[in-house]
């Protein structure tokens, strides 16, 4: 029977890693846990590679793997990056204070802190950063934001809404018609008179819009449904609810002061309503009501003529007495 002697200098199984460069497993102490550290979410200890004297054909392989060794620079210790322990069991209480923000903070915590800082200073991003000055400096927080008016804000319909508040109640019977040339104002007014009884209309002296007041809200909604309609194959008209409080207040004040100026124009008897006396604009065009009346009326009123009457003077009586006339 042959006896095998064990060489005491020979490396035992498990003392040397299988491949070069693989990290060795950490040694467990006397009070080690039952589960290994990577299952509990612990970070592995940084491993510093130790230089070894290797001769033979494996030297070229090592030089191809690590070109830094050939340059002569000292090897840098491998520091593992922090990973989120979302899949590992908890290792501390949720009420414990985190002392190190780099190791204890998660991406969710850092994202929440960034959102809180942006909410606390909303005017930081509005100012233009100066070269050499931080955007999050306290000097930029108190500066007012400089806004540039857009083309929509320069529009008169947009600026009229700046004076409105949440407590204001607008009259739903008023609509604003815009987008027509000045020469076609009467034509557009005649077209919108077909959608309801127009109580009053106010035209702009220099602009391309007019405010129309209907008798009921239903008629105003019918006019609002014509927004974007093309009239005369060349005029696209826009219709919006009126937000000009001055026009509404002046109209109500004029009705209360002089009720005779409030002129109601039914479409069955009059095609184009005449302007009230409170309107400052003087119309130079011929009213269309005359031609419309003549074409729709069934009866024509003849003006009174000069009819002969009996002379009751003294001379006529004397002649009648003498000659028997």
From Swiss-Prot:
Q: Where is the RRM Nup35-type domain?
A: 169-249
**Which family is annotated?**
Belongs to the Nup35 family.
**Which CDD domains does this entry report, sorted A to Z?**
RRM_Nup53
Q: Which organism is it from?
A: Mus musculus
| GO CC, alphabetical | nuclear envelope; nuclear membrane; nuclear pore; nucleoplasm; plasma membrane
Supply the name of the protein. Nucleoporin NUP35
In the UniProt record, does the keyword Transport occur? yes
Provide the assembly information: Interacts with TMEM48/NDC1. Forms a complex with NUP93, NUP155, NUP205 and lamin B; The interaction with NUP93 is direct.
List of residues that carry Phosphoserine: 53, 55, 66, 73, 99-100, 121, 137, 251, 258, 278, 283
Top-level taxon of origin = Eukaryota
Bilayer topology: Peripheral membrane protein
- A GO MF label: structural constituent of nuclear pore
Using the record's annotations, give every residue carrying the modification Phosphothreonine: 106, 128, 264-265, 272, 274, 279, 307
């Amino acid at each position: 029977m042959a006896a095998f002697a064990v060489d005491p200098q020979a490396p035992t199984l498990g003392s040397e890693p299988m491949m070069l460069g693989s990290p060795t497993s950490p040694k467990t102490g006397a009070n080690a846990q039952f589960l290994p550290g990577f299952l509990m979410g612990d970070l592995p200890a940084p491993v510093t590679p130790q230089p070894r004297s290797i001769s033979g054909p494996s030297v070229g392989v090592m030089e191809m793997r690590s070109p830094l060794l050939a340059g002569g620079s000292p090897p840098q210790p491998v520091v593992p990056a922090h990973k989120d322990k979302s899949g590992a069991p908890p290792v501390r209480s949720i009420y414990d204070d985190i002392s190190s923000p780099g190791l204890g903070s998660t991406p969710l915590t850092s994202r929440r802190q960034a959102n809180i800082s942006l909410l606390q200073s909303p005017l930081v991003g509005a100012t233009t950063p100066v070269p050499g000055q931080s955007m999050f400096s306290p000097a930029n927080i108190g500066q007012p934001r400089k806004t540039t008016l857009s083309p929509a804000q320069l529009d008169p319909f947009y600026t009229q809404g700046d004076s409105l508040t949440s407590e204001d109640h607008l009259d739903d019977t008023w609509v604003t018609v815009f987008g027509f040339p000045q020469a076609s104002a009467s034509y557009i007014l005649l077209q919108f008179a077909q959608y309801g009884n127009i109580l009053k209309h106010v035209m702009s002296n220099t602009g391309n819009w007019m405010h129309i007041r209907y008798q009921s809200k239903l008629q105003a909604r019918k006019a609002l449904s014509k927004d974007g309609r093309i009239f005369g194959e060349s005029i696209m008209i826009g219709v919006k609810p009126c937000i000009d409080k001055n026009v509404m207040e002046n109209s109500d004040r004029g009705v209360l002061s002089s009720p005779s100026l409030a002129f109601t124009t039914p479409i069955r008897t009059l095609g184009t309503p005449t302007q009230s006396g409170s309107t400052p604009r003087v119309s130079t065009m011929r009213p269309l009501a005359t031609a419309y009346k003549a074409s729709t009326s069934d009866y024509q009123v003849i003006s009174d003529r000069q009819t002969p009457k009996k002379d009751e003077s003294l001379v006529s009586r004397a002649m009648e007495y003498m000659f028997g006339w």
